[in-house]
Amino acid sequence: MTKPLSSVNLHQLVQQVITEQRHSSILCAPKVIQEGVYDPGILKAVFTAGGPGSGKSYLADVVFGVRTAKDKPFFENASFIGSNGLKYVNSDRFFERELGKLGINPKDLRDIADLPSDELWDIVQSADEPESARNVAKGYLESLRNLYEKGRLGMLIDGTGGKYDKMVREKSLADAMGYDTYMLFVDTSLPVAIERDAKRDRTLGPQLVEEIWQNVQDNKERFKELFGDNFAVVENSVYGPPPQEVIKSLNNFV
């Protein structure tokens, strides 16, 4: 007489049978996986670097063919870039939304920074205040970026490149997740950067613009070494279409 199975052994047997059936169905009726590493944009991360007013977002739109030089910024109305499917990673729109909730016009940020009291500035920008508009915006962006990374979706990571160590960390993390990385460095002269900043809604002022611009310039050669062949510089002191070789290089990359 066969000895009855214990509840534990019975559970293990059922699991084994189910597993074997699953494996058998896969072998007998295999399905073609539609997604892969060769899909446009998949596992591609394009970093931008450039000081205030350099036109990084403008150039990215033109490079990937989602607008001409005369069109309005594409990234204001969408979270992806054209047929390549790259996702924009930029906290600006979230930050401006939080400013709107506070009833603050972005044009007033510089005046707020100059106030004798730091109370209002802390509400807007303080890194130590968890509920500041800037930190809330960064939180939204981090959640969105985590979602993109889990799906290994392609990303355009918009930044100034003013902090070299931060860029090294971000690139290393992307590399570890299997991403191929590229940097688009957008260059302008300091006078042009200051002039353009003065015309922006969120002006930084000449002193801060010069500080950031210099930090970015100091990192330029190091970025070139860090990214190797996947590094392109566009001189954008005069607005215009980027060189065709840059457009071709980036589109071939993604």
Feature map (PLM): residue ranges:
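Conserved substrate/cofactor phosphate-moiety recognition/catalytic segment
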Residues: 63-151, 165
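Conserved lysine of the Walker
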Residues: 56
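Short hydrophobic/aromatic beta-strand immediately N-terminal to the Walker A/P-loop
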Residues: 45-47
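Pre-Walker A adenine-sensing motif
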Residues: 29-39
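The conserved Walker
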Residues: 51-52
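Hydrophobic positions on the alpha1 helix immediately C-terminal to the Walker A/P-loop
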Residues: 59
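Conserved phosphate-donor/acceptor-positioning beta-strand/loop module used by diverse small-molecule
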Residues: 162, 175-196
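Conserved GTP-binding G-domain of TRAFAC-class P-loop NTPases and closely related GTPase folds
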Residues: 66, 70, 83, 190-254
